[in-house]
Amino acid sequence: MKQEHIMKVFWTEEAKIEFKQTLMYWTIHNMSDSYSKKIDVETLKLVKEITTSPYLLANYIETIDAYKRVFFKSRFILYYQVDEKNDTIYILHFRSSSQKPL
């Protein structure tokens, strides 16, 4: 059986901050962390998928030289770059789909 190739993942500081702020916003807005936990789980699922198939269902955004994946009922967007030479995925931004596009 052929083993699946898994790329490394690196979150930029900006992406980490955006992700944490989103989770905090929904926890405060809903007065509960249950929705934030769902966002976290769906994000981890997507990142895992990207590590093995980075181009699957992704749109390339030439102006920012990054790939874009919309996920979790089209509510959130992950922007990332693929560095095949270093076998790494760089998560650049985590955004709500209601925010102004990059």
Short names for language-model regions:
Residues 1-41:
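Arg/Lys-rich, positively charged N-terminal/basic patches that mediate binding to nucleic acids
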Residues 2, 72-102:
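Enriched for short, Lys/Arg-rich terminal
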Residues 13, 30, 54, 74, ...:
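Short, well-ordered turn and helix-capping elements at secondary-structure junctions
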Residues 14, 62-66, 102:
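Localized chelating/binding microdomains
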Residues 23, 44-47, 95:
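Conserved protein kinase catalytic domain
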Residues 23, 51-58, 102:
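Short amphipathic alpha-helical interaction/hinge segments
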Residues 39-54:
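Compact soluble domain cores
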Residues 53-85:
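Basic/aromatic recognition patch in beta-strand/loop cores that engages polyanionic ligands
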